């Protein structure tokens, strides 16, 4: 694609392609191409259409969702182009299609498409359009499946991450450890990115760290510990001090000396007797490799009788040479109990052996954690500083999909509606504007949709907000602040300014700030208060006029 199409003539930065090279125009459902052909055959392919991308219900039994995936959608738009090879394949899939349709596909791009969206990382709610896509119906129809694919999982896993952050609390570190359990390579990469967006602090996924600049965290597994048989396997025993001024020629012996001191300590001697020496060898070896970031997995054999004492011996030896060990990881057992016992042990070492700060060692917990287990740990009382969460986080174990939809709401300036016996599936017609209204305490009160040409809500002026389908649900609101939600992120080749795609860190900061600004009763895990989504009185009347106009009238005989 030429730079003037991808970046505009305003000198805006050229937009790279999607992170995953599999995201091409062929990442589509077949019926998008059959409809494109039918539109083209009927001469309707250039008719101006408006589609809304939205969801109908918040995930995980909650009352909020985090919007994610917008950046990847814009990258897809900016680089939308079918190759000759792809066009040949589409032709094979549509037997009997005319050759001229291939010429049409060959000329397709998104230079006549406009996309308005809520900023990525925003807290969003059902029915309100996350994205409004305008353009020739033949092109926009080919954006539906890719956009839904890019937004559905991204928003789901970002919301899952935000919920884990909420239950863990602001003070805890959250580490995403899900690569090995994710649904394939893209599931792993996407989950790492959007878990970070949703409030996690770091990932173990090296590829995601490289691609997105996410902080990396990780130490060692049980395999490393059990691979050692004794300290005799440690060949290089030399440790240079942190300041570089001294050298310990036999760090192994220094560790063993500290272990004996711990064993003979009056307050600690009753907890353990002999520790596992192969584990001690593994810890010592790892500390020699990473003296500045030593953190040990202590549950390979026995946490309190071996893992913790062995860790302390190595950490105390490192301390003598100017290094501060980071802490431990617990991957099994009663995490609440073991974390408390470990903390007590560390505090006793600090007190008995006069080592300032030793009691503040970081305790990391893993082992199939999820919202429920973290909530249970909180209720039991624990001393965990960081949670490593994998399977339940990245797979969104408690809900498989978000359920975003992409619905036509206007074509050739004519509003359209999708009806259903299930009222939750009735679409809200016409090209709309969306606003968030804030109350006196600074919290959002309601999101309201209006017709495109309606005057916007004004601060201090009373406004009637109506439920889109339930006539008895209505309320007056006097907003103290009004925020328009949809902003332009793509104007095709038009020489007009558009929103700049912010870096991931800024999107993450936005997400955290928005979540903090929500009313607490909307955020709680159990029985959260639903957030109000409404339409203006004028739009309400129009929805029901169009509904009656389009619904067939039955006849009784």
Swiss-Prot record:
UniProt record similarity statement: Belongs to the NAPRTase family.
Primary role: Catalyzes the first step in the biosynthesis of NAD from nicotinic acid, the ATP-dependent synthesis of beta-nicotinate D-ribonucleotide from nicotinate and 5-phospho-D-ribose 1-phosphate. Helps prevent cellular oxidative stress via its role in NAD biosynthesis.
Gene Ontology molecular functions: glycosyltransferase activity; metal ion binding; nicotinate phosphoribosyltransferase activity
InterPro entries with a match to the protein in the record: Aldolase_TIM, N/Namide_PRibTrfase, NAPRTase_C, NAPRTase_N, Nic_PRibTrfase-Fam, Nic_PRibTrfase_pncB, Nicotinate_pribotase-like_C
UniProt-listed Pfam families: NAPRTase (PF04095), NAPRTase_C (PF17956), NAPRTase_N (PF17767)
Annotated binding of nicotinate, by residue: 31, 219, 329
Pathway noted in the entry: Cofactor biosynthesis; NAD(+) biosynthesis; nicotinate D-ribonucleotide from nicotinate: step 1/1
The protein's Enzyme Commission number: 6.3.4.21
Lineage: Eukaryota, Viridiplantae, Streptophyta, Embryophyta, Tracheophyta
Transmembrane segments annotated in the record for this chain: none
Record-given protein name: Nicotinate phosphoribosyltransferase 2
Keywords linked to the UniProt accession: Glycosyltransferase, Ligase, Magnesium, Manganese, Metal-binding, Phosphoprotein, Pyridine nucleotide biosynthesis, Transferase
GO aspect biological process, one term: NAD biosynthetic process
Induction summary: Up-regulated in the quinolinate synthase mutant old5 causing increased NAD steady state levels.
Binding-site positions, 5-phospho-alpha-D-ribose 1-diphosphate: 391
Catalytic activity: nicotinate + 5-phospho-alpha-D-ribose 1-diphosphate + ATP + H2O = nicotinate beta-D-ribonucleotide + ADP + phosphate + diphosphate
Cofactor requirements of the protein: Mg(2+); Mn(2+)
